[in-house]
């Protein structure tokens, strides 16, 4: 499993607890110093958890990440205007970014069961950085967030749908009672906070 935008590791910690007894390898990607220090301590005795102190993008390099406070869940590569929420992303730090296709090859990863990605509007760039590996033949499930951060990054839900469907996925919205597979419609591009799951066609056929 890939946890992209791991923050302080709460999601991966939940997966670890729910998968006790199973042979699952977790790869966490967290570029900010404070969060990475936290997950380094939290998972220091875990043999099947690999921690990576960089972010995912479509190019290798460096960038500035903005946040309102350390370990904020709003940390973003886009300096968002959050005046409506009485918040200001007035702190920043420089971080490393990497394409994940190179990482997959370096670590000889053969298959990814699940990707959770929550990087405040930068999801499409991260998907592009997977190259040929962001494909339904290589990845089973992808959980991603959509909302106001996509407005700031100028990324539409339509672009995410098109990118994923072209690569063999069906896209479902997370609802209170489960997943609801939906065809894209323009009215869905309302930038209201929601979570989606892309499901590999081969998984759906099982």
Model-derived regions: residue spans:
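Phosphate/nucleotide-binding beta-alpha loop and adjacent structural elements of enzyme active sites
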Residues: 1-206
């Amino acid at each position: 499993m890939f946890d992209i935008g791991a923050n302080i590791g709460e999601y991966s910690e939940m997966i670890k607890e729910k998968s006790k007894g199973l042979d699952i390898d977790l790869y966490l990607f967290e570029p900010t110093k404070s969060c990475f220090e936290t997950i380094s301590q939290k998972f220091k005795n875990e043999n099947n958890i690999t921690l990576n102190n960089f972010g995912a993008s479509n190019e290798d390099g460096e960038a500035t990440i903005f946040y309102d406070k350390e370990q904020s869940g709003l940390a973003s590569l886009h300096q968002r205007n959050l005046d409506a929420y009485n918040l200001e992303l007035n702190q920043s730090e420089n971080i490393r970014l990497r394409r994940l296709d190179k990482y997959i090859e370096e670590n000889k990863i053969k298959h990814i069961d699940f990707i959770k990605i929550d990087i405040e509007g930068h999801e499409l760039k991260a998907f592009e950085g997977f190259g040929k590996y962001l494909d339904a033949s290589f990845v089973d499930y992808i959980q991603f967030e959509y909302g106001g951060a996509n407005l700031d990054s100028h990324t539409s839900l339509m672009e995410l749908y098109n990118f994923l469907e072209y690569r063999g996925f069906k896209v479902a919205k997370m609802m209170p009672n489960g997943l609801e597979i939906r065809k894209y419609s323009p009215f869905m591009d309302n930038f209201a906070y929601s979570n989606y799951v892309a499901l590999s066609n081969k998984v759906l056929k099982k």
